């Protein structure tokens, strides 16, 4: 199977979350971790000093059923993004979100909360749909 290339606009913040947040270009970042995974591997190792200074806020949520810890970081005054992200995550885990939102709606909500442009969000949705239908050239 040929390796898929990621189109422009898909994942442009990956690995640059802290840099973009400190520049004020990204309001929120989200990382998930499991027991035994180092912060270096998660991607949020550099956030601690800025959390300590109050330049970035940190919200954590541990799900005892899955042993997954979600780490949400935001700029001051953007706390609502972390709170809404956690609410949506809880609704997805319970299944309630899928009675209200389509998967594309959820991708748009998450992308908006994370600070992606509308164009990047739509590029991600098209890319994700193409991965679900490998023999299809249109979405």
Segments (PLM) and residue ranges:
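A conserved ligand/cofactor-binding region detector
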Residues: 1-98, 109, 118-139
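An amphipathic, hydrophobic-aromatic interaction surface with interspersed Lys/Arg
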Residues: 104-111
């Amino acid at each position: 199977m040929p390796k898929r290339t990621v189109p422009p606009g898909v994942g442009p913040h990956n690995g640059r979350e802290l840099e973009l947040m400190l520049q004020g270009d990204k309001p929120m970042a989200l990382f998930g971790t499991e027991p035994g995974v180092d912060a270096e591997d998660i991607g949020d190792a550099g956030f601690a000093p800025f959390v300590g200074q109050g330049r970035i806020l940190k919200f954590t949520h541990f799900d005892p059923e899955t042993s997954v810890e979600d780490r949400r970081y935001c700029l001051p005054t953007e706390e609502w993004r972390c709170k809404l992200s956690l609410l949506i995550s809880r609704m997805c885990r319970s299944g309630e979100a899928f009675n209200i939102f389509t998967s594309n709606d959820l991708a748009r909500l998450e992308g908006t909360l994370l600070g992606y442009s509308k164009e990047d969000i739509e590029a991600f949705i098209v890319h994700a749909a193409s991965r679900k239908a490998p023999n299809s050239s249109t979405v």
